[in-house]
């Protein structure tokens, strides 16, 4: 850009000098020599500027980089068994599931969300028979039947389970909290039998289908430990429903 400016400026001077009668025009050779010198000076200037930029970049690249401040280790969701504190119990609200209960006494009723299921109560007291019967009478319409028969109950002695990673973990049966320890209970639902009728599930066309009742599982949060080291809330599998599994009979369309 600067070279073009010099050429235009010199051309302007030549025009002015050509129109002036009082001044002598510069010789052609001297004018060309002046233009060449100006162009060379501009090229040299650009070359020096580029070299200075390269030197500056090389110098900055040799400087030691400022070390980033060390990150604080993220707070682990798991605690050592010996250091298990009340914080884990306070996390129950965040991780709570209606099928998991922490209590200092055995629950006598199903969770509110599962009042309509076939609940099998504890046979400790005889006066609870009517209560168990009331929970079991959930069929409100005559003539309606389930394809599979299921039963639900509180599991009070669960000691191990499979977590979401496929690892076997230990389920904490008792958690010490001050004066009164609490226990962990699981409300599970499973099939009463694989074949409620002779040929499998109830109401299935056995001419075209093979059927069988199977217990299905899902994940809930529970207090567990792995290798008796770290305690925390993990996703584990428990029995939660009974479903009918179908497969088409070979040769049937």
Swiss-Prot record:
Disulfide topology: 148-213, 191-242, 201-244
Propeptide feature ranges: 19-134
InterPro entries according to UniProt: Cystine-knot_cytokine, Nerve_growth_factor-like, Nerve_growth_factor-rel, Nerve_growth_factor_CS, Neurotrophin-3, NTF3_N
Segment forming the signal sequence: 1-18
GO molecular function: growth factor activity; nerve growth factor receptor binding
Glycan attachment points: 127
Main subcellular location: secreted
UniProt GO BP: cell surface receptor protein tyrosine kinase signaling pathway; modulation of chemical synaptic transmission; negative regulation of neuron apoptotic process; nerve development; nerve growth factor signaling pathway; neuron projection morphogenesis
Entry keyword set: Cleavage on pair of basic residues, Disulfide bond, Glycoprotein, Growth factor, Secreted, Signal
Source organism superkingdom: Eukaryota
Cellular component annotations (GO), alphabetically ordered: axon; dendrite; extracellular space; synaptic vesicle
Subcellular location: Secreted
Region annotation Disordered: where it falls in the sequence: 62-89
Function per UniProt: Seems to promote the survival of visceral and proprioceptive sensory neurons.
Name this polypeptide is given: Neurotrophin-3
Lineage: Eukaryota, Metazoa, Chordata, Craniata, Vertebrata
């Amino acid at each position: 850009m600067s070279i073009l400016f010099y050429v235009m400026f010199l051309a302007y001077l030549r025009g002015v000098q050509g129109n002036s009668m009082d001044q002598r025009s510069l010789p052609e050779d001297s004018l060309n020599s002046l233009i060449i010198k100006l162009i060379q000076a501009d090229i040299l200037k650009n070359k020096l500027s580029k070299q200075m930029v390269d030197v500056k970049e090389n110098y900055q690249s040799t400087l030691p980089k400022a070390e980033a401040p060390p990150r604080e280790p993220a707070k682990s969701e798991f605690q050592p068994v010996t250091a298990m504190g009340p914080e884990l119990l306070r996390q129950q609200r965040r991780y709570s599931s209606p099928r998991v209960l922490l209590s200092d006494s055995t629950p006598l009723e199903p969770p509110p969300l599962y009042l309509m299921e076939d609940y099998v109560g504890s046979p400790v007291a005889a006066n609870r028979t009517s209560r168990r019967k009331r929970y079991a009478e959930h069929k409100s319409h005559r003539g309606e039947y389930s394809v599979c028969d299921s039963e639900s109950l509180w599991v009070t002695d669960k000691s191990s389970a499979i977590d979401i990673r496929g690892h076997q973990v230990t389920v904490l049966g008792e958690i010490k909290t001050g004066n009164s320890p609490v226990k962990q209970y699981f409300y599970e639902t499973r099939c009463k039998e694989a074949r409620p009728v002779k040929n499998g599930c109830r109401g299935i066309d056995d001419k075209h289908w093979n059927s069988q009742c199977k217990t299905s599982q899902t994940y809930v949060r529970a207090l567990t430990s792995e290798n008796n080291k770290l305690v925390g809330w993990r996703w584990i599998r428990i029995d939660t429903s009974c479903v009918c599994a179908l497969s088409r009979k070979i040769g049937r369309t």
